[in-house]
Amino acid sequence: GGSDRTAADLGILFHKKYDTVIDLEKDSSVVSADPKIVKDKLDAVNELSYNEARLAGMFGMKIIDPIAIKEILENGVEIPLIITNMKSPEMITKIQRKPEDRSGHPLKIVTGKKNCAILRIESEMIRDLLTSLDKDKRYSEFIVLSPFTKDGIEFSRILFLDGDYVKRNEKYILSFDPLA
């Protein structure tokens, strides 16, 4: 967690002056599922986009801190991240804005996360909630899902990755749409 963020911050600082690549030495490169749960037939994942790696991290992949990738994205820089398996240095995963190799199966990683919550809110009210979560609460552990229309009203859904956060902040969240 902390070392990933520090490496990302240093990469962001140095990228203008130097050709920067962040190499993170880990116990494993990225594989197709959690090796603590799936024991056999794990596939090596050679490349991921920033977005794929960030979402996989948010949903339980422990190999890289999703906030490190978020910081790179927010600063608008292109810095490749290389995850190197310390036991087998030839096993690497390259993470960058747009992966070079788009061949192969589109399903790369299977993850899972407990204790999530989905909030349904009228789409016209979501902007204020998202702005407040970002600025006031400094909370970003959520994903906005595809909107849908019911009875002529457009709704958005937010997947919160911490159900306890939603419980602790229920009044605050409902203040944006009491019918949510």
PLM region spans:
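C-terminal catalytic "cap/lid" subdomain
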Residues: 1-180
